[in-house]
Amino acid sequence: MIEASKLRAGMTFVTNDGKLLKVLEASHHKPGKGNTIMRMKLRDVRSGSTFDTSYRPEEKFEQAIIETVPAQYLYQMDDTAYFMNTETYDQYEIPVVNVQEELKFILENSDVKIQFYGTEVIGVQVPTTVELTVTETQPSIKGATVTGSGKPATLETGLVVNVPDFIEAGQKLVINTVEGTYVSRA
């Protein structure tokens, strides 16, 4: 059992009514009067829906035991993403709504890890950094480095990130998948 005050982003837990929830954001909140509460943004792992809720810090939940296996992203068709276990060659179908954030960072044939809760496939874990190519960005302007604000760039997966002014279309970039931000040129 884990207390609500110990839940952090990325953790998965089971509620008293059997829902499997993943924490997207968690913060302590102390109102002017009354007790501290934990405000959380959660995703129902099975349905893919996200919602905001509050818990008392002392509320207890069962922490979900999540196992991972190495896999490869094959392709997406309609509302389903297809993955293959690289050890057993078993294929898994995952609804896109459950992995839409992760799909922003991976291309076909990318290595990932499939997450299981018991025998149920619940999601995909991508590497902390990936290399993606810039498909579209504004041209560089001489002397524009003084502001340092950067410019938006569209990557080959459709993800838009803010990049420095010297980045041009066609360049490969290292992207942080946790924050969805530019790290460096590859």
Curated annotation (Swiss-Prot):
Pathway given in the UniProt record: Protein biosynthesis; polypeptide chain elongation
Keyword terms: Cytoplasm, Elongation factor, Protein biosynthesis
Compartment list: Cytoplasm
Keyword Protein biosynthesis: yes
Main location (coarse class): cytoplasm
The family this protein is said to belong to: Belongs to the elongation factor P family.
Database matches in HAMAP family: EF_P
Name listed for the protein in its UniProt record: Elongation factor P
Organism: Streptococcus thermophilus (strain ATCC BAA-491 / LMD-9)
Lineage: Bacteria, Bacillati, Bacillota, Bacilli, Lactobacillales
